[in-house]
């Protein structure tokens, strides 16, 4: 959510930011509705004061049958009617303003490049060495040949975009989760938590998922939503709180299953594990003061990069352009991993700086150490990493011509010293 006071003072800057995203200007509408709303509030307050004075004067009239008493009563009645009319109009204006404000995206950072789509994103760096693999197989071919990636059985019980991982691939998934969290907690000082995977609508609103992306999540019949990312519960830990500046920044890491309806993804990545309704993800989250937030954004991104470095996976860092950046994001880096079978980079992590956008929705504040002033915090989050896509990257980048897959060295201790994943000779199902 944006600050209405800032919009009043900077309407042109708002429209400029919206224009970079390809959105029509709305500052005139906002300022007009806001002005009418403030006028209504002023009129209501004036009438309430007048009513109070008249009601007080009634107490000094001892003859309740007098003309003066009757006139004042009639005046108070008319004032009440007028207040009711104005309050109805005020509610209408507040609703109109709220609808516009709730659908306003975050301001784009000054260093975010202009662009209309992902083709105009800016590659900042490429890391790692791309191996020359002759006739590389797709991850789903490798998984099937190993006998450890079962889409058919999953589809029978759950429909499309689900998978069952078996034996060493299930073990690899567990190893990756533990490895990622160990790196983030021991090397980058993130604090591990295990949050709920079901939340109420207000928690989704606080991070910017609602109302705009209501159809992107799964909703239960009892008023819950399955989280699309651990960003939702982690951000809401600090909702309606005021933290002390000396306690900041706070860095959290969590592994959760994530659930997405993938509305609008028909025909995209229909084969394999790239786009699933359910997937595991290790999420990084930081809450910080505005003066620390840019540094913390770079720090969080570096933590996500470190996983790719340790696993020996080629990747690149991409700065998203104004037309590709997320609704709530101020600035975003995508980490894209190399997939040999697709002969291209694919997103494996998205790290975003949200400035005060989410904090204003969730009322997350801090008290300055010296001045004791209370201000809104800044939030930052990113994948560290998406576990399923990391499995994909390992299968494709570490595939061998005999059908086996080499386990990255950093994961071997997490897999009992195992060095290779070889095809199953028999399976229980």
Swiss-Prot record:
It is an enzyme of class 6 (ligase). GO terms for cellular component: cytoplasm. NCBIfam families: serS. Catalyzes the attachment of serine to tRNA(Ser). Is also able to aminoacylate tRNA(Sec) with serine, to form the misacylated tRNA L-seryl-tRNA(Sec), which will be further converted into selenocysteinyl-tRNA(Sec). Consists of two distinct domains, a catalytic core and a N-terminal extension that is involved in tRNA binding. HAMAP family: Ser_tRNA_synth_type1. Belongs to the class-II aminoacyl-tRNA synthetase family. Type-1 seryl-tRNA synthetase subfamily. This is Serine--tRNA ligase. It comes from Orientia tsutsugamushi (strain Ikeda).
């Amino acid at each position: 959510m944006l600050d209405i006071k800032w919009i009043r003072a900077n309407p042109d800057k708002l429209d400029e930011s919206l224009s970079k995203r390809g959105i029509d200007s709305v500052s005139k509408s906002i300022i007009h509705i806001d002005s009418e709303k403030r006028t209504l509030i002023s009129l209501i307050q004036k009438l309430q004061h007048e009513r109070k004075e008249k009601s007080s004067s009634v107490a000094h009239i001892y003859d309740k049958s007098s003309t003066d008493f009757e006139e004042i009563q009639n005046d108070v009645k008319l004032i009440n009617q007028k207040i009711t009319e104005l309050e109805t109009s005020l509610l209408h204006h507040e609703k109109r303003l709220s609808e516009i404000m709730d659908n306003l995206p975050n301001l784009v950072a000054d260093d975010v490049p202009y662009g209309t789509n992902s083709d105009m994103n800016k590659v900042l760096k490429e890391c790692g060495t791309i191996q020359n693999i002759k006739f590389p197989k797709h991850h789903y071919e490798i998984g099937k040949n190993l006998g450890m990636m079962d889409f058919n059985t999953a589809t029978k019980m759950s429909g499309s975009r689900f998978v069952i991982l078996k034996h060493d691939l299930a073990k690899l998934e567990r190893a990756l989760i533990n490895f990622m969290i160990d790196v983030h907690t021991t090397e980058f000082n993130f604090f591990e938590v295990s949050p709920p995977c079901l939340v109420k609508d207000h928690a989704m609103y606080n991070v910017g998922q609602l109302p705009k992306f209501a159809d992107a999540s799964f909703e239960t019949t009892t008023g819950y939503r399955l989280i699309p990312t651990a960003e939702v519960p982690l951000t809401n830990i600090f909702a309606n709180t005021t933290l002390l500046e000396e306690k900041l920044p706070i860095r959290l890491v969590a592994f959760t299953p994530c659930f997405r309806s993938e509305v609008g993804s028909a025909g995209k990545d229909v084969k394999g594990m790239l786009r699933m309704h359910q997937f595991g993800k290790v999420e990084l989250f930081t809450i910080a003061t505005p003066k620390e937030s840019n540094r913390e954004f770079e720090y969080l991104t570096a933590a996500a990069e470190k996983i790719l470095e340790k696993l020996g996976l080629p990747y690149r860092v991409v700065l998203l352009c104004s037309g590709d950046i997320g609704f709530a994001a101020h600035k975003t880096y995508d980490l894209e991993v190399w997939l040999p079978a697709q002969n291209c980079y694919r997103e494996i992590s998205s790290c975003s700086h949200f400035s005060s956008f989410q904090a204003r929705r969730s009322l997350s504040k801090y008290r300055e150490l010296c001045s004791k002033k209370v201000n809104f915090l800044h939030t930052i989050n990113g994948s560290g990493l998406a576990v399923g896509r990391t499995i994909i990257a390992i299968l494709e980048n570490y595939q061998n011509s005999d059908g086996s897959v080499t386990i990255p060295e950093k994961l071997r201790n997490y897999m009992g010293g195992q060095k290779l994943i070889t095809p199953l000779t028999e399976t229980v199902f």
